[in-house]
Regions:
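Leu/Val/Ala/Ile-rich N-terminal alpha-helices, chiefly Sec-type signal peptides and the beginnings
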Residues: 14-84, 91
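Non-transmembrane, amphipathic alpha-helical segments
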Residues: 21-35, 71-74, 96-103, 120, ...
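Short, hydrophobic/amphipathic alpha-helical patches that form generic packing surfaces
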Residues: 31-45, 106-117, 188-200
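Conserved mixed alpha/beta catalytic, RNA-binding, or beta-rich assembly cores of soluble enzyme
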Residues: 42-43, 52-58, 116-119, 131-134, ...
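Long amphipathic alpha-helical segments with strong coiled-coil/leucine-zipper propensity
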Residues: 65-145
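Conserved binding-pocket/active-site segment within a compact domain
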Residues: 137-206
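Alpha-helical oligomerization segments
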Residues: 185-238
Length: 238
């Protein structure tokens, strides 16, 4: 299997560089970025509280199995799947003084660094893609329970991504982080965040854009978010 793929002029790549979409190029970038930020926000939440918004966790987890998504938003089921991420993009880019937003931003930067290393390892990409394919088969034919799938995805992360030179340090409540279930959730979210970071880069996103296009990114995320159902403070949908 070839991973998260698309086609352009008969060539194939690991990321969706050629998705057909009704969204503008900037909107597509922001949707992918929302996937990164959403994963980062939930990593922080699980690490600190042991809780997470199930609907958005499910959307992030399922994005790992979107090998042939026809559009950017379809990677997450639909754009509603990254509603929390869109709001979090605005939070991260407009309020750098909030402690939770700072932590979220640190995870985002870490995921982008991790993706940069992952992107240079086609051998690792093939292993991750193959093993995710096996987990996806299990989800389709046996159990699709998100927590059970997270345990399998966590093992993939430990066997592959955790061996890259850069390591993301997760900070939170030791009591929560020592629980196997929460550790699995965190690793699953980190891999989902890396997946979105890969997509973001394929769509033209670059870390320097936070500095030079931060206002535009936040405004675009806000506009997209306003078109969707509201999200409560704990991350759930109304």
């Amino acid at each position: 299997m070839s991973g998260w793929r698309c086609y352009r002029d008969g060539t194939q790549s690991f990321g969706e560089t050629c998705l057909v979409s009704s969204f503008t190029p900037l909107q597509q970038q922001v949707i992918a970025l929302a996937g990164v930020v959403q994963a980062a926000r939930m990593v922080d939440q699980v690490a600190k509280t042991g809780s997470y918004p199930a609907a958005f966790f499910e959307a992030s987890l399922r994005s790992l199995f979107a090998f042939d998504a026809p559009t950017v938003d379809a990677v997450y089921g639909n754009i509603q799947g990254v509603k929390l991420g869109l709001r979090s993009v605005v939070d991260m880019l407009t309020d750098a003084t909030n402690e939770d937003h700072v932590a979220m931003g640190a995870y985002v930067r870490g995921l982008l660094k991790l993706e940069d290393q992952f992107g240079k390892r086609p051998d690792l990409q093939e292993v991750v893609a193959s093993r995710l394919g096996h987990v996806n088969f299990k989800a389709q034919h046996f159990s699709d329970d998100a927590v059970e799938l997270a345990a399998s995805i966590s093992a993939i992360y430990q066997d592959t991504i955790s061996h890259l030179p850069y390591r993301i340090k997760v900070k939170g409540n030791v009591q929560h982080l020592q629980q196997t279930k929460n550790a699995d959730l965190v690793r699953t979210l980190l891999l989902a965040g890396l997946r979105s970071a890969y997509l973001w880069r394929q769509l033209g996103g670059r870390p320097r854009h936070f500095l030079f296009k931060g206002g535009k990114l936040a405004a675009t995320a806000s506009d997209l978010s306003k078109q969707l159902s509201p999200v409560t403070d704990n991350g759930s949908l109304h």
